[in-house]
Design a protein with these regions (language model features):
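Conserved active-site and cofactor/substrate-binding residues in soluble primary-metabolism enzymes
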Residues: 7-10, 26-33, 57, 122, ...
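A charged N-terminal "starter" segment
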Residues: 1-136, 175-183, 214-217, 222, ...
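Short, glycine-/Ser/Thr-/acidic-enriched flexible segments
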Residues: 30, 57, 80, 101, ...
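Charged (often Lys/Glu-rich) extended helix/loop segments that serve as interaction or gating elements
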Residues: 257-261, 265-370
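Active-site loop/helix belt of alpha/beta enzymes
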Residues: 144-290
Length: 370
């Protein structure tokens, strides 16, 4: 797909007169259209809710936009809980999914009435000791171990991840939680990151749906929801094809009808936590070229740095770059696009073919919304 900015050079020229670079810019129209598309894709499930991953974009204005579409908040820290609370999210609209969790964070989540999603078997006793009870509604994060594979070769390694209960632990955990007073249960799993395929959610759903039937049969627990978490990705590179949320939703529905409905579990709600999919393409980092350097390589220095966008510096992530006003010019110059931090990893692009960049040019770094 061709990567085009959602803003024109003329619009940016006006914006920078008021807001100096660098800054993040968001496409409200795109955010709203995407949120509506997600709702429509899962409208077959009456209890569906997207719990937006606050860590992806901890911005109160954006949280309030998503709240208009009945989104909740997926929180993993005290700060995120405080932000969700400050914007009027409460009770069942907050999912607290944390790991290595401090006692005060469990206590605050319980105070807000959030759904607590336990990451570890030992957290059952820790939670009870911390807040003095087990909530009536509780969730557990599942990790099946091994390697998670899909037909297109995309894979991840849950067995090497620090998160979640094992298969044996989640069965035993549900039994213990029920004995301690829990009445309503949920499960959660995140098995692969940024999957650019419509196959991931339906395959994950089948695995979790089968587990839920087993949990119901072996524990007698009343399972109210299944949280498919995140992992639905976006096309950072121009040669990638975007996911189709309608196809994804239909794939999950088919698995639901095949597995849960015949088992008498057709009233279970489906939840998601698609932070990247909800916001990634609808934000960009706008920065200005302020220096050029000609040594062993050609460098363009911009006024943004890794503090504004960490993904490239942390793990070499690709973010497409558009030189505004030069979209139709040939990409015949090879540059490293760098920030000013005293770390050599502070680079937004390495050996990137771009049009000739002049000082003062505005650069749009794509897909920074999450």
């Amino acid at each position: 797909m061709e990567k085009k900015p959602f803003v024109t050079k003329e619009q940016l020229d006006e914006i920078v007169k008021k807001y100096p670079t660098p800054f993040h810019l968001y496409d409200e129209k795109g955010i709203r259209e995407n949120a509506e598309a997600v709702k429509e894709a899962f409208a077959w499930n009456p209890g569906f809710r997207e719990y937006f991953a606050v860590k992806a974009t901890p911005n109160p204005f954006i949280l309030n936009i998503l709240k208009e579409y009945d989104c909740g908040c997926d929180c993993s820290s005290l700060t995120e809980l405080m932000l969700a609370d400050s914007q009027g999210f409460d009770g069942q609209h907050i999912m607290f999914s944390s790991n290595d969790t401090p006692a005060e964070e469990f206590a605050f989540a319980d105070e807000l009435g959030a759904i607590i999603n336990l990451d570890d078997f030992t957290h059952i006793d820790f939670l009870e000791q911390t807040i003095g009870h087990i909530p009536e509604t509780i969730s557990c994060r599942y990790n099946p171990g091994g390697v998670f594979k899909m037909s297109n070769g995309i894979m991840d390694n849950p067995g090497d991840a620090k998160y979640g209960f094992t298969h044996e632990q989640i069965i035993e955990g549900f039994k213990i939680l029920k004995e301690k007073g829990a009445k309503y249960f949920g499960i959660h799993a995140f098995l692969a990151s940024n999957t650019v395929t419509n196959e991931y959610y339906p395959k994950l759903a089948r695995q979790l749906f089968e587990l839920v039937v087993e949990l119901r049969d072996k524990t007698g627990c009343d399972i109210k929801f299944i949280n498919l978490s995140g992992g639905v990705g976006i096309p950072y590179r121009p040669d990638q094809t975007p996911n189709d949320i309608r196809v994804i939703g239909e794939g999950v529905r088919e698995a639901f009808e095949e597995i849960l409905v015949p088992a008498g579990l057709g009233d279970i709600s489906i939840y998601s936590e698609m932070g990247r999919f909800m916001l990634g393409p609808y934000g960009c980092l706008v920065t200005k070229a302020i220096h050029e350097k000609h040594t062993y390589k050609e460098y363009i220095g911009v006024d943004a740095c890794a503090a504004n966008l960490m993904r490239p510096a942390i793990y070499g992530a690709y973010h497409h770059i558009t030189v505004m006003g030069k979209e139709n010019e040939p990409c015949d110059h090879k540059y490293d696009v760098t920030g000013s931090l005293c770390e050599n990893c502070d680079k937004f692009a390495i050996d990137r073919m771009l049009p000739k960049i002049d000082m003062g040019d505005l650069l749009v770094i794509h897909d920074t919304g999450a």
